[in-house]
């Protein structure tokens, strides 16, 4: 288990601090397949996962949904034939919190499933 994925998410309040530029740089090294991008003025993490077909993409989406429910932290998910696009950010603060990086790392761990190509 990666260092980041083994960390616990914390309850996030509306006044919680967003990650700093330095924290962003440090944390991105731990999830190198994710891209930071600004969407509607909010910094998010995004990654596209590829699969052999829609059934595998949907199975991954469902596993991710279970993970999100367990942590009470939910991503934006777009499921298509052979592809799932996942975006993490913290709605309450309108940007990135450490929890988003933890959840991105945990999302990566779902790839150990043999359904992923």
From Swiss-Prot:
It catalyses: (4aS,6R)-4a-hydroxy-L-erythro-5,6,7,8-tetrahydrobiopterin = (6R)-L-erythro-6,7-dihydrobiopterin + H2O. GO terms for biological process: tetrahydrobiopterin biosynthetic process. CDD domains: PCD_DCoH_subfamily_a. One of its GO terms (molecular function) is 4-alpha-hydroxytetrahydrobiopterin dehydratase activity. It is an enzyme of class 4 (lyase). Transmembrane segments: none annotated. Keywords: Lyase. Its EC number is 4.2.1.96. It comes from the Bacteria. It holds the Pfam family Pterin_4a. InterPro entries: PCD_sf (IPR036428), Pterin-4-alpha-carb_dehyd (IPR050376), Pterin_deHydtase (IPR001533). NCBIfam families: PRK00823.1-1. Belongs to the pterin-4-alpha-carbinolamine dehydratase family. This is Putative pterin-4-alpha-carbinolamine dehydratase. It comes from Aeromonas salmonicida (strain A449).
